[in-house]
């Protein structure tokens, strides 16, 4: 049960990124009329924050531990998801009202994934390769399903993407807090 909490935590956080990857070209290029040659710059903001967060995690995890870093990431994901839904629903902030919470969400996926994998490995020290392979397979499998679901109906606004990303962030946090037996704690 605890191991499944870590697996689902990592898989659902990654699935939020799959929702973004599937829907963002429509949202940015079609809905907000971003020129196609500028899409890469907006996409790159996600990678930039992901690099910064990954670097910070590599330094901070030694002092505060993987669980605390994971709990921090699992606080950011649902909050970014909630802000994303609010901005998409209320049309607050225009393009940047969508880009900023998406960057916050996607930028923290590597932190959640790495620290969730650390927690999972603690459950399977003798079969870490098998556990890691299963977790990776589920990340891509669930992500593919989420990517398909977010695009089943042609979107008319950023809201379907926002709902999918937020649901993945909340699901990731709930999987951890309900299945691992760890107490919820804001980092």
Language model features with spans:
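Multi-pass alpha-helical transporter architecture, strongest
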Residues: 167-187
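Transmembrane alpha-helical segments of major facilitator superfamily
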Residues: 42-50, 139
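C-terminal transmembrane helical hairpin of 12-TM major facilitator-type secondary transporters
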Residues: 68-115
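Small-residue hotspots at the loop-to-helix junctions and early N-terminal turns
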Residues: 36-44, 132-133, 162
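Pair of pore-lining "gating" transmembrane helices in MFS-fold secondary transporters
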Residues: 2-19, 103-107
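Helix-to-loop junctions at the C-terminal end of transmembrane segments
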Residues: 53-67
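Short amphipathic helix-loop junctions that connect adjacent transmembrane helices
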Residues: 22-37
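A late C-terminal transmembrane helix in Major Facilitator Superfamily
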Residues: 117-156, 164-165
């Amino acid at each position: 049960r605890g191991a499944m909490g870590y697996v689902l935590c990592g898989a659902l956080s990654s699935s939020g990124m799959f929702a973004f990857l599937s829907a963002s070209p429509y949202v940015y290029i079609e809905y907000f009329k971003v020129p196609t040659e500028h899409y890469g710059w907006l996409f790159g903001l996600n990678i930039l924050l992901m690099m910064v967060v990954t670097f910070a995690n590599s330094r901070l995890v030694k002092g505060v531990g993987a669980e605390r870093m994971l709990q921090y990431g699992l606080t950011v994901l649902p909050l970014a998801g909630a802000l994303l839904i609010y901005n998409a629903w209320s049309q607050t902030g225009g393009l940047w009202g969508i880009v900023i919470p998406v960057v916050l969400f996607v930028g923290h996926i590597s932190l959640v994934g790495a620290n969730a994998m650390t927690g999972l490995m603690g459950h399977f020290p003798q079969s870490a390769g098998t556990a890691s392979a299963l977790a990776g397979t589920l990340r891509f499998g669930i992500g593919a399903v989420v990517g398909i679901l977010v695009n089943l109906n042609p979107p008319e606004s950023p809201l379907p993407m926002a709902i999918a990303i937020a649901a993945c962030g909340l699901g990731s946090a709930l999987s951890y807090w309900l299945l691992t037996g760890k107490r919820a704690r804001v980092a």
